[in-house]
Amino acid sequence: MKTLCFLLLTSGLLYLMVKGVGSHPGTFHVRIKCMPKMTAVFGDNCSFYSSMGDLCNNTKSVCCMVPVRMDNI
């Protein structure tokens, strides 16, 4: 029984490595970009702003999280 579980686990992991996690059409991924605060305030299209810890550690920039459909990549 342990051998069967081990084989199922390894085959599942191999499938994910070959296929890719979240690479199915219709799924959403989040792309994060840093932009100057003035650009963010004055019209750059961003659906969600956040402070992402050390990612945008400059006080003059903000993080923009943009949902991207896998069909568009």
UniProtKB/Swiss-Prot annotation:
The keyword Oxidoreductase does not apply. InterPro entries: Defb50 (IPR035193). The gene is Defb50. Disulfide bonds join 34-63, 46-64. It is found in: Secreted. Has bactericidal activity. GO terms for biological process: defense response to bacterium. This is Beta-defensin 50. Its main location: secreted. Belongs to the beta-defensin family. GO terms for cellular component: extracellular region. The keyword S-adenosyl-L-methionine does not apply. It comes from the Eukaryota. Highly expressed in prostate. Not expressed in uterus, epididymis, ovary, testis, spleen, submaxillary gland, thymus, thyroid, pancreas, smooth muscle, skeletal muscle, heart, kidney, lung, liver, eye and brain. Residues 1-23 form the signal peptide. Pfam families: Defb50 (PF17546). Keywords: Antibiotic, Antimicrobial, Defensin, Disulfide bond, Secreted, Signal.
